[in-house]
Amino acid sequence: SALKILAEDFTPLPVYGVVDPGAQAAAVQADASGVLVLATESTILGGAYQRALLRENPSLPVYGRACPLWVTLAEQGWVGDQATSLTQHALKHGLRGFLREAPQRSMQAPQQPKTVLLGCTHFPVFRKQIEALVGADVQVVDSAQTTAITVSDDLSKLGLLRDGPAANHEMVFLATDGVARFRKVGGYFFGGPLRNVSLVDL
């Protein structure tokens, strides 16, 4: 995988992916009803989250749902206060049939998985709307957030986590294509304009 290659190339620097932290957190929270993974089509077809979840719990029912339109909506900024009826319709469409995909037990009616894993780093911008749609009894796990927690914990263990105020901190962003677009889209996720964006050639 690309993560494995990068980890080898950048040793001893740690390289993180979002799949394992997200899967680990979802597996911990999940019950026998299983986990519904929401991600892009390529991620679902690739099966990375499904494999990672089953490594954590081989008996865990895992369901995948590709939601490619959500990425487009997020990148166009149709989120939060800018969300439209189209956004709401697309979210409902992405969750369609999700009650019917859960396992049947003793010929009883299908049950809704009680854990939803946001398997794309674009999807947290829709988290509140997704939580409202799936109901309060469903746990929504954000793979991006769990990855950030993992990185923070590791930095703390290594004594590299910054303590105290972050007034003098500086964020640097590296983009492999389209700096202007990266700034625009990134602003939706960071809640403001991005500075210090540089184009890099990999």
Go through each PLM region and give its residues:
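Non-catalytic structural scaffold of enzyme domains
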Residues: 1-202
